[in-house]
Swiss-Prot record:
UniProt region (Disordered), positions on chain: 1-23
Protein name: Uncharacterized protein TP_0857
Biased composition (Basic residues): 14-23
Length: 106
């Protein structure tokens, strides 16, 4: 009798397993976050602090992300808040926020 139910041995789809392993900050930085060495990952008490934001900037630079795309900036705004966002923009793009905005247009 074919009931149409999946067999009991069916595995969980790989995309579902990946979703379970996703870190909270991965949405802000896309797949580059998956390349993070363990030493750069922030602990829970650092999360959202200036130290954490600097670590994220170093992570982006280490992964070869020189200019963060506008969509990433919007996600970062939502995750870190405006103050930390401005600090991260300076860390990634250079001395001024204007310089960072120019890098986004490229």
């Amino acid at each position: 009798m074919a009931s149409g139910a999946p067999p009991l041995t069916q595995k969980t789809p790989s995309h579902a397993r990946r979703k379970e392993r996703r870190r909270p900050w991965a949405a802000a930085f896309g797949n580059h976050a998956a390349l993070a060495p363990r030493a750069l990952l922030a602990s829970e008490q650092d999360r959202g602090t200036e130290r954490h934001v600097v670590r994220r900037a170093l992570l982006l630079i280490a992964c070869g992300v020189v200019a963060v795309r506008r969509t990433h900036l919007e996600a970062r705004d939502a995750y870190f808040g405006a103050h930390a966002c401005a600090h991260l923009s300076i860390c990634v793009h250079g001395d001024s926020r204007k310089q960072g905005e120019e890098a986004n247009r490229v």
